[in-house]
Each structure stands twice: as C-alpha cells, then as structure tokens.
C-alpha cells in the first residue's frame, strides 16, 4: 500500500509548487509601482510608491528603503508629497521575510520640459508610454518627439506617445521640444532600452504541464497495480480459506502407520 500513498504526495507537491503558466508558485519578490507611473518628476510634484506582493503571505507591515536607509513608513504605500531633490534616488520595499524588491529609481528635476517614460528598461512585447511634461503642468504646444536625433512625432497640442508592443528597435535616446509661454524649450535626453524576453519561460510552459501529466500517469499506474496486487492476495487468501473448510482434517500418511 505504500507506493499508492507516495505518488499522490509527489503529484500534490508538483501542483502546489508550479502555477498553471509554468512559473514556480513560491513567494516572489514584491514589486514597487509608481502612481503616476513616471519615475522622473518635477520638484513640488507628488508621487505614490506601492509595494505590491503576491498574496502568498498576509502582509502586516512593509519596510521601505531609500538609498539603503530604512524609512519610518510601514504601510504598503509610500507617499512623496511636494517632492524635493533629496527625494531622488533608489527605493526598495520588503514584506516580512520575503526578499527585498528590485530597486526603483526616482529623479526630481527643475526644468521647463521633462520627458517622462513608463519605464526606462522595457521587456520586448511590453507597452511603452512617453510624455512631454511641462513645468507646473503648463500647456506645451508644437511638441516634437525625437529618437536618436531624428524627429519621431509632431503635435500642435501636446499628446503622449504610445508604443503597444515595444521591440529592440525602439531602444534609443529620446527627448522632446515644445513651446511654453511662446518660448522654445528642449527636455533632457532619456535613454530607453528594450531587452529581449527570456526564452526559458516558453519551454517551462510546456514542461511543467507535461511533468504533472507524467506524475498523474505514474500515480494512476501505481494505484491500479497496487489494487490488482491487493485483489490477487485477497483472492489467494479466500481460496486457501475455502480449501481448509472443504478439507478440515488432513489425510493420514500411510508411511506413518
């Protein structure tokens, strides 16, 4: 009976530790998100950093780190109000005993125009948004976006650039120009890098379900085999018992007489 108990355990372990999309279902690092989603902001603006977990543990408190120093904030959200230059730098968060998040870098500027991006490093296939932002949200007209020194897009009224599926060809140096109060201004350049998506996950999406199917097949096979063995042993036992009932007294051996 032992084999029948061991294999379901293996199957359960596989189902617990592997998610349907082929990713290990173990506690992952938390991730810091920004709202608004720009990591380059003007002095005096507000931004909220949120430490997003994966709900593996019930989060009771959060640790925030700014440039390596522990913050007094223990909530899952860190509010930066009336941003100062000192608020620039690296931010990380941590939930309980889970590893620290990957760092997020915030930059505080004082300028007339600021090119903002949803991310400076983008995974291939992910969306990318660019914004030519005016100081104190002042209107910007005759906006031109540039990539690697060449004009990319022009609008008389300011609009964002939306790239639905970023490719490695979208990597480059971006900046924007525009008019604020009838004066021409140019933003600081921003380097955008699009990296290729890792290929390992694709084969994992096929391997993990296959592993579960194999474990299930082994589990079923062992269960059937064990059932057959038990049935066979019970049949032998019943046969021997029936034979003893039909022959309660053994026949005498003539040689002993």
Curated annotation (Swiss-Prot):
Q: Which UniProt keywords apply?
A: Cell membrane, Disulfide bond, Glycoprotein, IgE-binding protein, Immunoglobulin domain, Membrane, Receptor, Repeat, Signal, Transmembrane, Transmembrane helix
S-S pairs: 51-93, 132-176
- Indicate the transmembrane segments per the record: 206-224
Principal subcellular localisation of the protein: membrane
UniProt keyword Membrane present: yes
Where does the UniProt annotation locate this protein?
Answer: Cell membrane
Q: Where is the signal peptide?
A: 1-25
Protein name (Swiss-Prot/TrEMBL)? High affinity immunoglobulin epsilon receptor subunit alpha
Quaternary context: Tetramer of an alpha chain, a beta chain, and two disulfide linked gamma chains. Interacts with IGHE (via CH3 region).
UniProt gene name: FCER1A
Q: Which SUPFAM superfamilies match?
A: Immunoglobulin
Report which superkingdom the organism of origin falls in. Answer: Eukaryota
Q: Name one GO cellular component term.
A: plasma membrane
What ranges are annotated Extracellular (topological domains)? 26-205
Topology relative to the membrane: Single-pass type I membrane protein
Name all Ig-like domain ranges: 30-110, 111-193
The record ties this protein, via SMART domains, to: IG, IGc2
Membrane topology (Cytoplasmic)? 225-257
Q: What does this protein do?
A: High-affinity receptor for immunoglobulin epsilon/IgE. Mediates IgE effector functions in myeloid cells. Upon IgE binding and antigen/allergen cross-linking initiates signaling pathways that lead to myeloid cell activation and differentiation. On mast cells, basophils and eosinophils stimulates the secretion of vasoactive amines, lipid mediators and cytokines that contribute to inflammatory response, tissue remodeling and cytotoxicity against microbes.
| Coiled coil, from the record | none
Q: Which Gene Ontology BP terms does the record give?
A: cell surface receptor signaling pathway; eosinophil degranulation; immunoglobulin mediated immune response; mast cell degranulation; type 2 immune response; type I hypersensitivity
């Amino acid at each position: 009976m032992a084999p029948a108990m061991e294999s379901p355990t293996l199957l359960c372990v596989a189902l617990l530790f592997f998610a349907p999309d082929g990713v290990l279902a173990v506690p992952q690092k938390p991730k810091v998100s920004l709202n608004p989603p720009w990591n380059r902001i003007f002095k005096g603006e507000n931004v909220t950093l949120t430490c997003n977990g994966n709900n593996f543990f019930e989060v009771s408190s959060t640790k925030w780190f700014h440039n390596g120093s522990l913050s007094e904030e223990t909530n899952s959200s860190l509010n930066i109000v009336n941003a100062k230059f000192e608020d620039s730098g690296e931010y990380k968060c941590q939930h309980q005993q889970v590893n620290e998040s990957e760092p997020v870098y915030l930059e505080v500027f004082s300028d007339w125009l600021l090119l903002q991006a949803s991310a400076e490093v983008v995974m291939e296939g992910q969306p990318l948004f660019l914004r030519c932002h005016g100081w104190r949200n002042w209107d910007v007209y005759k906006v031109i976006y540039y990539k690697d020194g060449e004009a990319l897009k022009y609008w008389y009224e300011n609009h964002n650039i939306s790239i639905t599926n970023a490719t490695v060809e979208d990597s480059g140096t971006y900046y924007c120009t525009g008019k604020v109060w009838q004066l021409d201004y140019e933003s600081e350049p921003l380097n955008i890098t699009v990296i290729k998506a890792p290929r390992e996950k694709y084969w994992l999406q096929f391997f993990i379900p296959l592993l579960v199917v194999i474990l299930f097949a082994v589990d079923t096979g062992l269960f059937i085999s064990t059932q057959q063995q038990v049935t066979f042993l019970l049949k032998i036992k019943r046969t021997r018992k029936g034979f003893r009932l039909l022959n309660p007294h053994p026949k005498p051996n003539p040689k002993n007489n």
